[in-house]
Structure formats: C-alpha cells, structure tokens
Amino acid sequence: MSSNPSRSNSRSKNGDLESGLKFVDNDHDSKDIEARNRNHFYGFRAEPIYDQTERLANQVAELQEQQKRLFGPSGADFEPNIHRLRYINYGNPAPFGLSAFAFTTFLLSLFNVNAGHVKVSNMVTAPAAFYGGLAQLLASMWEMASGNTFGGAVFGSYGCFWLSYASIFIPWFNIQNSYDDPNDFNYAIGLYLICWFIFTFLVLLCTVRSTLAFFSLFMSLDVCFLLLACAFLRTSDGSPNVVLIRVGGAFGIFSACAAWYNAMAGLATIENSFFTVPRAIFPWSLEGLGPEEANRRRMMADDK
C-alpha cells in the first residue's frame, strides 16, 4: 500500500518544527541557567563591584575635601589653634587621653582635700601608672601619628609625669626610703612639682587663643602645681603645709572637671547623644575675629 506523499511531507515538516522549537527552548534554558548562575555568583557579595568602586571614590573625595578644610580651636580635638582634620583612618585619641588625665587627677585631688578623711593616698599609685601614665603615652603616640604636635607633646609629658609620680611611692624603686630626713624628701617633691609648674605654664601660653574650657584646664592645673609645690617646700615637722595641700587639691578637682568637659566634647555627637557640648571661644581667638580677618589668617595658614 503506497503512502500518502502529502501526509509524509506534513509529518516531516512537523518534526522539523518540533526540533526547531526544542532547539530554541534549549537555547533559552541555557541562557536562564547562565543568568541564574551569574546571580548566584554575585549573590554572595553585598553589592556589585562597580557600586563599591563608586562608593569608595566618593569617600576618598569627601576625605580629601575635609583635609582642605580648616577647623578652629577645640579642646575635643586637643588643638589650641586652627587645624585640619587629621584623624582620618582612625578615631580621635584626645578624649581617651583627657579621660585618663581627668580620672587620675580627680582621684589624687580628692585625697589632697581630705575627702573621707583618708590618711594614706597610695591607692592612686595603680591608676597613676596604668591609666594616667600608660594611657596618656598611648594617646600621645596616636596624636603624633595624626600630626598633632601639641597633643603628642602634652599627653606624652603628663603620661610620664604620672608614671614618675607612681614610681616615687613604689617600694621597688626605693626612692622614698632613700631619704633619711622627711624634710629633705618633701623639699625634693616640692622641686619636682616646681618643674611641672614651669612646663604647665608653657603649655598654658599655647592655649590663650583657644576655648574657655581648654584654657581653664591648664590654668587650674598650673595653680594646682604651684600650690602643691609651695606646700611641700614649706614643711613643718616633716609634713607638708596642710592648707596649701587642700587648696591645691581644690584646683586639681576643677582641672579634672575641665578635662572631662573637653573629653565629653569629643565624645558626644548628634549621632549618639541628645546634646553636644558647647565651645566657649575667646573673642580674641581666630574664630572670634571678623569673617574677613579669619579668612585671611586661614589663607595664610593654608599657604604655610
């Protein structure tokens, strides 16, 4: 029996059409699989690479723009004059150093004003060595790395002050026990404090055009050193002058509070607090001058 040629031709055409459709479907499926694999590959990443590059470029441009800006005196940055933003890749070390200084100074000053009628002040030895001393040395190194010469010199110096003060009362160093006469020991302590009074006065001269809190910190600290030095130089019966010790302790408490105030100015921001610490800028500072004079001096500092 002969086959119908028209039916066979139609059957062959239908077969070719089905194979063509299968080929198209297979090609379409392969593209879907490739797209899914590509999405799966990039799914492990937070964002495409070109978005990361654009975001990084914007951050670099913003940091470069901040480097060009000049900021006024600030105790929060431990900067007594106009300065550029330096701590770009890490945080501001000034609040850490200021807090270490404030804590140790406040504790010793409480003993000096006879708070709680504590007779022996050796409790301050450990904080003086590890918080007031070591912490301020670390803050000094970070300030130096960020380009803040003032902060590095001051934090490093007072860190060494607390380390040396603690070593005086540590028996292993045998400093206090080496004096047979208590009056000689007290007089030596007085000379030691006079040296720190001179250094603090030099630092004070660098803050006369900054802020009120910044200037008050070193002004009260300088008076504290002077009164304590006079107390140890004017000894009676082997003991320092009690009245001068207590008055010096009061100035030390005020200095510690001023240091905490400046530290809080660097910690409290609009992102983490409901308030920010105000800056009381002296009218004779750069920020207190007129806009034209301030811009002129900023341009001069920028040229330097």
Curated annotation (Swiss-Prot):
Disulfide bonds: none
Keyword set includes DNA-binding: no
Gene Ontology annotations for the cellular component aspect, listed alphabetically: endoplasmic reticulum membrane; fungal-type vacuole membrane; Golgi apparatus; Golgi cisterna membrane; plasma membrane
Protein name: Meiotically up-regulated gene 86 protein
Residue ranges of the region described as Disordered: 1-23
PROSITE patterns in alphabetical order: GPR1_FUN34_YAAH
Gene source species: Schizosaccharomyces pombe (strain 972 / ATCC 24843) (Fission yeast)
Transmembrane segments: 93-113, 123-143, 150-170, 188-208, 212-232, 247-267
